[in-house]
Amino acid sequence: MLKVLVVVALLVTLISYSSSEGIDDLEADELLSLMANEQTRKECIPKHHECTSNKHGCCRGNFFKYKCQCTTVVTQDGGQTERCFCGTPPHHKAAELVVGFGKKIFG
């Protein structure tokens, strides 16, 4: 009976050791993924900045991702160009207002 307990304890130790190495590998992969996401986050376009060349590159706001909003601008020579900026759409502003109001009321 003692031999069985020793063998079981040895197996449990080996399994826990091997799984901890697997977890370390997993943590290293997650760390690399987080670093890549952080790099992407740094490259996003902040609110009120121009996004004409990268319409899907706006950063995230408090609750929602900013949207690239475009307008047509008439230049001095009479031509028209499209200018875009990252901003919060009206329905997102309304949702943020409701959530902020709810937080003030309900704490």
From Swiss-Prot:
Keyword Nucleotide-binding assigned: no
Cleaved propeptide residues: 21-41
GO terms for MF: toxin activity
Signal peptide interval: 1-20
A GO term from the CC aspect: extracellular region
Cystine crosslinks: 44-59, 51-68, 58-86, 70-84
Tissue: Expressed by the venom gland.
Keywords in alphabetical order: Disulfide bond, Knottin, Secreted, Signal, Toxin
Presence of the UniProt keyword Secreted in the record: yes
Parts of the chain that traverse the membrane: none
Compartment(s) where it occurs, according to its Swiss-Prot or TrEMBL record: Secreted
Domain notes: The presence of a 'disulfide through disulfide knot' structurally defines this protein as a knottin.
Family statement drawn from the similarity comment of this UniProt entry: Belongs to the neurotoxin 19 (CSTX) family. 04 (U1-Lctx) subfamily.
Protein name, UniProt field: U1-lycotoxin-Ls1w
